[in-house]
Curated annotation (Swiss-Prot):
One Gene Ontology term from the biological process aspect of the record: protein targeting to mitochondrion
Family: Belongs to the Tom22 family.
Gene: TOM9-2
Mitochondrial intermembrane domain ranges by topology: 70-99
Keyword Protein transport: yes
Subcellular location: Mitochondrion outer membrane
Spans through the membrane: 52-69
Protein name (database record): Mitochondrial import receptor subunit TOM9-2
Coiled coil: none
Provenance organism: Arabidopsis thaliana (Mouse-ear cress)
Role noted for this protein: Central component of the receptor complex responsible for the recognition and translocation of cytosolically synthesized mitochondrial preproteins. Together with TOM20 functions as the transit peptide receptor at the surface of the mitochondrion outer membrane and facilitates the movement of preproteins into the translocation pore.
A GO molecular-function descriptor: protein-transporting ATPase activity
Length: 99
């Protein structure tokens, strides 16, 4: 016995041009334009964010990293001076550098 398909008759098959009518409708073309605009804005935002990240990163490397290195060096020098003073038996006194 053959299986009976529901909606497969002449009237149940639908219009063969329904996809063409839907894809050519105004709402679909507006959606495509909106999607294209969203992609364009996303690309511009990504490009400008990358530029800002590059500027921030290079500024950090040029200005902040040498400062951190110098502060660490100064802390090491102070620690060595305190160790030497304690080995010599003198009470540790705060040294005033740069005056």
């Amino acid at each position: 016995m053959a299986a009976k398909r529901i909606g497969a008759g002449k009237s149940g098959g639908g219009d063969p041009n329904i996809l063409a009518r839907i894809s050519n409708s105004e709402i679909v073309s507006q959606g495509r334009r909106a999607a294209g605009d969203a992609v364009e804005v996303s690309k511009k935002l990504l490009r400008s964010t990358g530029k800002a990240a590059w500027i921030a990163g290079t500024t950090f490397l040029i200005l902040v990293v040498p400062l951190i290195i110098e502060m660490d060096r100064e802390a090491q020098i102070n620690e060595i001076e305190l160790q030497q003073a304690s080995l010599l038996g003198a009470p540790p006194s705060p040294m005033q550098r740069g005056l």
